[in-house]
């Protein structure tokens, strides 16, 4: 399978769309944003009056099923076919990242990418039992350059320090990470919902980067690769970049904000690097090392007048 690097933009619905400043191209792949600031000095010339960006697609008023078909279904097929993949959602606070990934728990029609993925996987595997694929899940938070096991509360064991391990073949795993087997859609959804519920108990945790991963393993040689299967599919809910709201460099808030911004900077460097790629510069990129070659980034934006 070929490497895939795709970027989509999902626009949050609004009744106050800033049409005077934002123009989405008729092709549905480009957007032009006018500069909102006026030059302070009238004698300056050649100032940039607008910025244009190109994407695989700009998604407006797109339903959850269409989002899944376009952005996630190919990644699932890759993972089951032998290539680890990554779905990465980023955007500002309230831009809709978590809605895209999870959706409301009590509205089946609006369920997000992860619940739809779990359902699709077991529908597909039910038709191919000869593949002998076992599915596991894990749920990790990244806070202040450290990894935390969200699902460990259901492990019945005291928490242990998580350590990212890289095998000689380049495969990434996490030592001491709780990775329960999920045998069907219901058990997978239970793990996801329990993890989300635990995170919601502490508001600070909702401001961290979280990573829900599905692991696929089989000792049976697979038809696409003629090798045993050991892949993963990551869903990353990126913490939003933040402005420093405190000057106290010793405070926990300062360190948390600095960690979020540093992770975003390292991730950007990894995504644009062509030669030496600094995967080990932060835990998130190190963990995603064997999956970022096949990635789908969903950038969430709000083009309402108030946000601009």
Where are these regions (language model features)?
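P-loop NTPase "switch/coupling" elements that transmit nucleotide state to mechanical/effector output
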Residues: 1-92, 102-293, 302
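Short catalytic micro-motifs in class I SAM-dependent methyltransferases
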Residues: 299
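Long, amphipathic alpha-helical segments that form or neighbor coiled-coils/leucine zippers used
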Residues: 306-308
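Conserved lysine of the Walker
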Residues: 97
